[in-house]
C-alpha cells in the first residue's frame, strides 16, 4: 500500500475519473441532481465517478474497506481504508464553475497517510504519501509558500456548522489580518493551499472524504495541519503555512 506504485495507481485512477467529470461538464443539460440537505447536492456525475473509482480501487487494492460521500460504506474496525469524494463542490460543478475536485485518500486508524486529488478544469493532480513530499501531475515538486504579507485564507461552510458560527470564525480570522474567501469546495481550497496560492484552509464539520487526501498532501507540502473528529463522521481541519499559523 505504501510503495511508490500506489501513488502512480491513484494518479491513473484520477485521470480517468477527471475525464468522466469533464465529459459531464460538456453535457450539463443532462445533469440530474438531488438536494441531500440545504445547499448540499448529489448529481448523476457524482454517482458515475464514485462507481468507477470504487471499482478501480477494488481491482488495484483488493480487500480494502471503502467509504464514499455518495454511496456510503464503512472503514474497518480500526478506522482504516479508502475515503472517496467523487465531486467536491457539486453545486459549483452544476453551475459550470471550475471550482470542483475529486479526492481519493487512504487513512490508517483515522490518519491520512496516502492520497491524490484532481482539479480537472485546471489540469492539476496532486498526490503524496507520508514522508514522500508533494507530487504535481506525477512529478515531485517543492511547494513554494505564499508571501507572508499576503494573508488570504479559505473558510469552509457546510450543513453541520451553523452559519452564524461560521461567520464568527471568519471574524476571528479577519482579526488575525486574513482576507477570508469561501469557494464552497474543501478539496479545491486545500489544493490551492498546498500549492502556496492560499495561506490555508479552515472548516468545522467536513467529511472524512474531504480531507483524507488533502490532509497528507498539505502536510507533505510543508503546511501545519491539524484535524480531529468533532462528531460522528464530522471533522474539523485547520491547515496553514507555518509562518501563517497562529500560536
Tell me the role of every PLM-derived stretch.
Residues 145-247:
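An extended, acidic
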Residues 64-65, 81-82, 114, 152, ...:
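Structural motif
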Residues 76-135:
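DPxDG-like acidic metal-binding loop motif
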Residues 47, 70, 86-89, 120, ...:
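Generic detector of well-ordered alpha-helical packing
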Residues 136-143:
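A structural micro-motif at secondary-structure boundaries
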Residues 20-24, 46, 57, 90, ...:
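Residue-level signal for inorganic ion chemistry
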